[in-house]
Structure formats: C-alpha cells, structure tokens
C-alpha cells in the first residue's frame, strides 16, 4: 500500500549560489559522510558534476521528507538520509540512526529516482507500507 509520494525540483543555480556563500559547510550539512566523499571526488575532477551530485541529493532528500510526511523535522535530517547507488547505478535510500528506527518501526520501504539537466535536478520518491 502506498504510504506517501514526494517530489522535488531543485534549481542548480540556487545550489551554486548557496555553495558560493557557505562553501563545503553546505555540503557537510546536506550530505552523509559517504556522500560527501563521492561529492568531493567528483567536484575535484568535474566541478559541474559535483554540483549536480549535490543538487540531486538535496532534491531526493526533500522528496523523501515529503513522502514520509515529516518535512525536515526530526527524526528526518539531512545526514541521516543517504542517497546511494547500486553497482547498476540505480539510486537507493539508506537510512541511519533515529530515522532508520522510525522508518522500520512503521514497516516502510522507499523507492527513489533522480535526474538532472543543465539547470535543474529533480527527484521522485514513493514510500510503501509493507
């Protein structure tokens, strides 16, 4: 049964402007440690791809927060929600700490898709109750 659906579109120019003001502090606030390592490697090699990576993660976490009906309030937090990729490239949501406990206690599972273009990143999340 569908528990919730969330979607988000993110303007890469907005992410770039925030990054210009806050620098790596912004990436640390939004990304898990594993995501930060991927972002750092991509940014050093291809700055535009690093920005797109940051924007897709921001967008996916916003969409997830909407799908679970919490928005950005506890137990939902940026760093407890990680968007990883399977070897095939498929994005998956990996939860940590309090958020993982909250999610599992409700018997939920999530599906995520992300996309990015020149100026936008978008995400769609479907959460099911098993």
UniProtKB/Swiss-Prot annotation:
Summary of the function given for this chain in its UniProt record: Transfers the 4'-phosphopantetheine moiety from coenzyme A to a Ser of acyl-carrier-protein.
Enzyme class: transferase
Superkingdom of origin organism: Bacteria
Catalytic activity: apo-[ACP] + CoA = holo-[ACP] + adenosine 3',5'-bisphosphate + H(+)
Pfam families: ACPS (PF01648)
Encoding gene (name): acpS
InterPro entries recorded: 4-PPantetheinyl_Trfase_dom, 4-PPantetheinyl_Trfase_dom_sf, ACPS, Ppantetheine-prot_Trfase_dom
Similarity comment: Belongs to the P-Pant transferase superfamily. AcpS family.
UniProt-annotated location(s): Cytoplasm
Cofactor: Mg(2+)
GO cellular component term of the entry, any: cytoplasm
HAMAP family according to UniProt: AcpS
Main location: cytoplasm
Name the UniProt record assigns to this protein: Holo-[acyl-carrier-protein] synthase
Keyword field: Cytoplasm, Fatty acid biosynthesis, Fatty acid metabolism, Lipid biosynthesis, Lipid metabolism, Magnesium, Metal-binding, Transferase
An example Gene Ontology molecular-function term: holo-[acyl-carrier-protein] synthase activity
Example of a GO biological process term: fatty acid biosynthetic process
EC numbers, comma separated: 2.7.8.7
Positions that bind Mg(2+): 8, 62
Gene3D superfamilies xref list: 4'-phosphopantetheinyl transferase domain
């Amino acid at each position: 049964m569908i528990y919730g659906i969330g979607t988000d579109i993110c303007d890469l120019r907005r992410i770039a402007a925030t990054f210009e003001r806050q620098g790596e502090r912004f990436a640390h606030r939004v990304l898990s440690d594993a995501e930060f390592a991927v972002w750092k490697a991509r940014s050093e090699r291809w700055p535009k791809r690093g920005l797109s990576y940051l924007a897709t993660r921001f967008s996916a976490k916003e969409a997830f927060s909407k799908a679970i009906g919490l928005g950005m309030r506890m137990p939902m937090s940026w760093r407890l929600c990680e968007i990883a990729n399977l070897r095939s490239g498929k994005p998956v949501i990996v939860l940590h700490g309090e958020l993982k406990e909250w999610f599992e206690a409700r018997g939920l599972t999530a599906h995520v898709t992300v996309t990015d273009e020149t100026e936008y990143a978008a995400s769609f999340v479907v959460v099911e109750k098993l």
